[in-house]
């Protein structure tokens, strides 16, 4: 008879020795995602307001974004990150809180770049809502 194999396999996290990297902060109206990568774009660590444990409207707060940045930066420091270039995308509440938390965590910030996409006369806007008067 065949032997039963264990269904769960665990992977040992390999430590990446990277000193310089890029911190991507993607802040939307509902959530903030912080990703640390090396200069080529390979992801080292990431965290979001949702992975920390917040749900619903609490995910979009600046406090939750700061905790996400703190969590991601601690993981990145374990892999050797010491200096980052911060790229901020989006218009959410947590963009400044996440950036400040990265600076406070002990990782030096070399530059801050806003890469929020700007529409150059993008898509057609929705049609205007007609206001109706109440019948007396």
UniProtKB/Swiss-Prot annotation:
Gene3D superfamilies in UniProt: Ribosomal protein S11
Gene Ontology BP annotations: translation
Keyword field: Ribonucleoprotein, Ribosomal protein, RNA-binding, rRNA-binding
Secretion signal span: none
A UniProt-annotated Pfam family: Ribosomal_S11
Gene Ontology MF: a single term: rRNA binding
Ranges of biased composition (kind: Basic residues): 125-136
Coiled-coil regions listed in the entry: none
Region (Disordered): 1-20, 115-136
GO CC annotation terms, alphabetical: ribonucleoprotein complex; ribosome
InterPro entries (alphabetical): Ribosomal_uS11, Ribosomal_uS11_bac-type, Ribosomal_uS11_CS, Ribosomal_uS11_sf
Subunit structure of this chain's protein: Part of the 30S ribosomal subunit. Interacts with proteins S7 and S18. Binds to IF-3.
Entries under PANTHER family matching the protein: 40S RIBOSOMAL PROTEIN S14/30S RIBOSOMAL PROTEIN S11
Function, as annotated: Located on the platform of the 30S subunit, it bridges several disparate RNA helices of the 16S rRNA. Forms part of the Shine-Dalgarno cleft in the 70S ribosome.
Family: Belongs to the universal ribosomal protein uS11 family.
Official protein name in the record: Small ribosomal subunit protein uS11
Gene: rpsK
